[in-house]
Amino acid sequence: MTKDNNNNPRYLAVKTLERISDGAYSNLQINNVIDSTKMSEKDTRLFTNIVYGVIQHRLTFEYYVSKLVKHPGKLQNWVKELLYTAIYQMIYLDKVPNRAIFDESIKIAKFRGHDGIRRLVTGVLHKIDRDGLPQITGVNAIEKQSIEASVPVWIIKQLNNQVGKAKTESILKSINQPANQSIRINIKKIEKKALVKELERIGFTVRDSEVAADALVLKDGVAAHTALFKEGFYTIQDESAMLPVQSMDIDGDDYILDTCAAPGGKTTQIAEHLTTGLVVALDLHENKLHKIMENAERMGVSENVDMVSVIICSLVL
């Protein structure tokens, strides 16, 4: 396994999840891994699926591991992430046989840890295979909802107060449905019809978004791993995240402040509508501001973007 680690989707998923749990942006980490490795298209999809799947179901998996391991608080972070990735595959990836999940997970445990960790991982996986996942018991109704839907308790309480218990239950049932792979067309660089043609030419299945005007929904490929993306003809953004800017009546000479701007999806979206105007991106972390400018340069809108650190702003004030 050692010689293939740099292109092993499961091994890379564990490492990526470690970085994300330490505060890194998930999309940036995923894109960095894809760009810096030589994974096949199939392995890239598996890697992306596992990382986003664990993020999506993290609270649920944390509960399971807390019941399957005697002292879960003593586990190293990478061991937790390894167990989460294995559990995700066992539950949600029907086409992957358990023997393959077990074999790969145990190899990673053996490579990264000592024999005790290998035995622990082996024991946990075989226990799940033999007895199934732990039942959710000993918690109140809201805590049970939180674990099942992987949504923090405080959010469920807020939803209950704002929209009522019935609507909250409906939201929680739908919240973990697989998200669309959506992109936002760079209207300064290309027309929708031309972009659709190019995407279909390189193998994507493309449809119009039902949510946002400048969005497309893609299947059968990885949107962040194309020359079209690198050349700034589109950016990756959730459909609903495009709506705030879409609702703005932006004039080309407007000056607009985007607070808490990172990672910059809305900043570049605003800039695409500007000619002589300017959008000022404000964020607490300077390294995140640099990433915004990288995206603005890729999208060809950097002349309409300026960046200000919150720290600098507070010193001036």
Describe these PLM feature segments.
Residues M1-L317:
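S-adenosylmethionine
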